[in-house]
């Protein structure tokens, strides 16, 4: 099945502590989760590693968020939207269901 949300898509969070926030998808995991820039930030206690030059301390990083808790953001309407697929010139393309525009 083709992915409705892909890397570099702008998404909006529908549920959870970051509800209403927008961000770009930086990674799509095979478990049905996404890593979105600036969303679902957690603090991680990192051990120092002198060989890699990594200083120890508390680091803030993005944790995966369930794909069902986000929706793709349609910049034309300014709202969350659903994605459909259709064939144009023999290629499968994604489009927004609300206004039938192609997803970048």
Swiss-Prot record:
One of two assembly initiator proteins, it binds directly to the 5'-end of the 23S rRNA, where it nucleates assembly of the 50S subunit. The keyword Zinc-finger does not apply. The keyword Iron does not apply. Pfam families: KOW, ribosomal_L24. It comes from the Bacteria. CDD domains: KOW_RPL26. GO terms for molecular function: rRNA binding; structural constituent of ribosome. Belongs to the universal ribosomal protein uL24 family. GO terms for biological process: translation. Keywords: Ribonucleoprotein, Ribosomal protein, RNA-binding, rRNA-binding. Disulfide bonds: none annotated. Part of the 50S ribosomal subunit. One of its GO terms (cellular component) is ribosome. This is Large ribosomal subunit protein uL24.
